[in-house]
């Protein structure tokens, strides 16, 4: 059963994201007193009592001819066209501004059910003539931040939603269940949003030549080859030393949190600004968090044909040298804007996701362990006693984690652990997967 869709529309900083968080089942929008934080259509499941719906947060709109404003208007127009109900928000502190009047006319021409939501009303509020002149028959005064007036808003929402669509509970969500969460990460302006738009064949995310357009993590539910996918676009991650504004800090924190809860991370790298230390830092962070990763070099169409082979050789060398913990990681060269090789990226993600969830039987593990340690045994210790790894078992997946029992685990060097991990990746077909070993001392002192 299709859920009702409610769009929150208004000029910048009227409190749309605050109300979005109030109505959503879980907080998803960054809230900041700087205007224009939201730049993409942001979707979440919302709920009022027993009623469930899909909620859209939209960019703040203002009358401005620059290209960014035009692109923001396109995002909001798409949300209005999708919506069954529009909540048009204004700020009671500033009163009705010229942009509010222009936007109200813009909304009314679509002939959709709408509610005028006057936000930031911390005290008793009386609607005067200027609010009625906006042309809405339903008006509610609220404070989204403090929660006042929300019951009145809930009543209006339920009353104004079209009756021919049911909004009862137990609505089937096609993307619940075994859903692969794929986070798109990278430095600013690497083409992350362009990649997602190309993948889903929709201008879902705002793109452009400006660095840092995406400020929040945007989730998109999608299906690919009968797999439920949640694509998560994130703000570009800059070096810590260059993050000075509080909003940039919030955006970076939001992106980092998305990586922590990801299944797979696609690291997008700009071919015209190849492999910087920040790219390596992001990849290391992903591996240290135990997430699976696919590396994508975007804007490959802009690299000269005569330079591509040398580029790839140097790129692979740098990855293998600086990121040994994800040795064998999939690297794909694409052009998001031309939709070149983009499906290969998703295929690689699904493969690595499967390997990230891999469970290996104890018998196969110990057969491999015996062969590998005999081929390259640990060196003898003082007194002629050899350090031995007697037994191992897998204790978890996501990432694959193994417990190894040894007579003297503290003598097992990091280099020997790398030897075992690299050999395991090859033996069990787990290239690029972060693998974790936990050594335990055997209780029997004679082994």
Swiss-Prot record:
SUPFAM superfamilies of this UniProt entry? P-loop containing nucleoside triphosphate hydrolases
Keyword terms of this UniProt record: GTP-binding, Nucleotide-binding, Repeat, Ribosome biogenesis
- Pfam families documented for this protein: KH_dom-like, MMR_HSR1
Spell out the molecular function terms from Gene Ontology.
GTP binding
Domain KH-like, residue spans = 358-443
The record lists GTP 2 as bound by 186-193, 233-237, 298-301
User: Where's the EngA-type G domain?
Assistant: 4-165, 180-357
The record's similarity note reads: Belongs to the TRAFAC class TrmE-Era-EngA-EngB-Septin-like GTPase superfamily. EngA (Der) GTPase family.
The family database entries (NCBIfam families) matched by this protein are listed as:
GTPase_EngA, small_GTP
Q: Subunit details for this protein?
A: Associates with the 50S ribosomal subunit.
Write down what this protein is called: GTPase Der
Species annotation: Rickettsia canadensis (strain McKiel)
Q: What is the lineage of its organism?
A: Bacteria, Pseudomonadati, Pseudomonadota, Alphaproteobacteria, Rickettsiales
Gene behind this protein: der
């Amino acid at each position: 059963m299709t859920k009702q869709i409610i769009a929150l529309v208004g000029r910048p900083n009227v409190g749309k994201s605050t109300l979005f968080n109030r109505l959503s089942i879980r907080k998803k929008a960054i809230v900041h007193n700087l205007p224009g934080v939201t730049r993409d259509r942001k979707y979440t499941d919302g709920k009022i009592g027993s009623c469930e719906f899909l909620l859209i947060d939209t960019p703040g709109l203002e009358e401005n001819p620059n290209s960014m404003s035009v692109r923001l208007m396109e995002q909001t127009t798409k949300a209005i066209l999708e919506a069954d109900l529009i909540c048009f928000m204004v700020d009671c502190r500033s009163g009705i501004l010229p942009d509010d009047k222009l936007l109200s006319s813009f909304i009314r021409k679509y002939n959709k059910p709408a509610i005028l939501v006057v936000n930031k009303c911390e005290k008793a509020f009386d609607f005067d003539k200027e609010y009625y002149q906006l042309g809405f028959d339903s008006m509610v005064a609220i404070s989204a931040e403090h929660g006042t007036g929300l019951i009145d808003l809930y009543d209006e929402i339920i009353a104004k939603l079209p009756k021919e669509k049911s909004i009862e509970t137990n609505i089937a969500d096609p993307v619940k269940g075994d859903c692969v969460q794929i986070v798109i990460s990278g430095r600013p302006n690497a083409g992350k949003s362009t990649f997602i738009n190309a993948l889903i064949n929709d201008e879902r995310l705002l793109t452009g030549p400006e660095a840092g357009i995406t400020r929040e993590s945007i989730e998109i539910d999608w299906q690919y080859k009968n797999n439920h996918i949640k694509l998560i676009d994130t703000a570009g991650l800059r070096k810590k030393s260059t993050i000075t504004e509080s909003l940039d800090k919030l955006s970076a924190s939001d992106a980092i949190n998305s990586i922590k809860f990801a299944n797979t991370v696609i690291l997008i790298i700009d071919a015209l600004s190849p492999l910087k230390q920040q790219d390596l830092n992001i990849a290391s962070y992903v591996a240290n968090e135990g997430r699976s990763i696919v590396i994508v070099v975007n804007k490959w169409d802009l690299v000269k044909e005569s330079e591509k082979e040398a580029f790839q050789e140097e790129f692979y060398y740098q990855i293998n040298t600086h990121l040994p913990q994800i040795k064998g990681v999939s690297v794909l060269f694409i052009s998001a804007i031309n939709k070149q090789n983009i499906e290969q990226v998703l295929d690689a993600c699904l493969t690595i996701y499967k390997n990230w969830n891999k469970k290996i039987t104890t018998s196969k593990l110990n057969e491999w362990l015996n062969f590998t340690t005999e081929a390259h045994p640990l060196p003898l210790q003082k007194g002629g006693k050899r350090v031995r790894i007697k037994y191992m078992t897998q204790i978890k997946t996501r990432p694959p984690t193994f417990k190894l029992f040894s007579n003297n685990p503290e003598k097992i060097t990091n280099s020997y652990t790398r030897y075992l991990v690299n050999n395991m990746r090859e033996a069990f077909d787990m290239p690029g997967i972060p693998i974790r070993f936990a050594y335990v001392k055997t209780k029997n002192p004679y082994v």
